[in-house]
Amino acid sequence: MTISAVPGTIILAIETSCDETGVGIACLDDYGTVTLLADEVASSVDEQARFGGVVPEIASRAHLEALGPTIRCALAAAGLTGSAKPDVVAATIGPGLAGALLVGVAAAKAYSAAWGVPFYAVNHLGGHLAADVYEHGPLPECVALLVSGGHTHLLQVRSLGAPIVELGSTVDDAAGEAYDKVARLLGLGYPGGKVLDDLARTGDRDAIVFPRGMTGPADDLNAFSFSGLKTAVARYVESHPDALPADVAAGFQEAVADVLTMKAVRAATGLGVSTLLIVGGVAANSRLRELAAQRCAAAGLMLRIPGPRFCTDNGAMIAAFAAHLLAAAAPPSPLDVPSDPGLPVVKRQIN
């Protein structure tokens, strides 16, 4: 594919919020359709696994080493060769690891200045919401459950170009964080999500019933808590040394999926929307996807979950979110805008 054959606005986006170096290139056409042209990801997860979690300094150095080659691969894959260049450059401005964000933001600003094109500083979490459009088309009004290693949010999304309303979030650990901690407890290593999911498939999810946090009559309907669940698993393993790890994993995973899907479906039906969107790294979990499909079908909701490729961090999702901001006539960001490691989910862009 050559760039001259692709009409529309070409967006190059950089994602470096954690341990994946992602570069995505997408095209926004005159009808608002977003088409993915390139999606390249380099990960430092193997280096991080030696330490049982993400080490910020290692992540930052890995981004420095990987970003140049990853950008060149993406440009070549999209057909941006010779003097061809994108029309817009975007980057994750937050939330994320401070040093990791700086690498991607600095590179994006430099390319924006060198090419003389606008720069968009966008929210990483908004990118997760937008990732689904590549596979399932324009996103209707929905309730979104965003679950990842560092975040667990229930959101009302009227459109990807409109302000996002936060309905609730975790009061302690994120769901993905709990997965990593329980996986470490069971000696499964890091990252814990996929390996724990694989182990849980071989266990009996009804053998051990773990507590469901924030589900009491006095609890916030849209809030989550996974710290108590993590502690309950630790105490169970300590007091039952002969327990099958697969049953522990299955019981833990069932508790997480039960709470997430129950609260998400209830929020969607309560607001009268017809679509539930589930995104983020934890959205790749097989039991969460299965239980969400069952409960959405029972409630008459349309369920949208991107494929596992678009659940984890990547540049394609940042390009998609930037495209929707462009379509909504959002102004570009100044080149002196700082990154924000604690950027709230409701702040779509810094400009």
Curated annotation (Swiss-Prot):
Provide the binding site for substrate. 146-150, 180, 193, 197, 285
| EC number(s) on file | 2.3.1.234
Report the top EC class in one word.
transferase
Q: Which GO terms describe its molecular function?
A: iron ion binding; N(6)-L-threonylcarbamoyladenine synthase activity
Q: Which cofactors does the annotated protein need, by name? A: Fe(2+)
What HAMAP family does UniProt report for this protein, alphabetically? Answer: TsaD
Q: What is this protein called?
A: tRNA N6-adenosine threonylcarbamoyltransferase
Organism this protein belongs to? Mycobacterium leprae (strain TN)
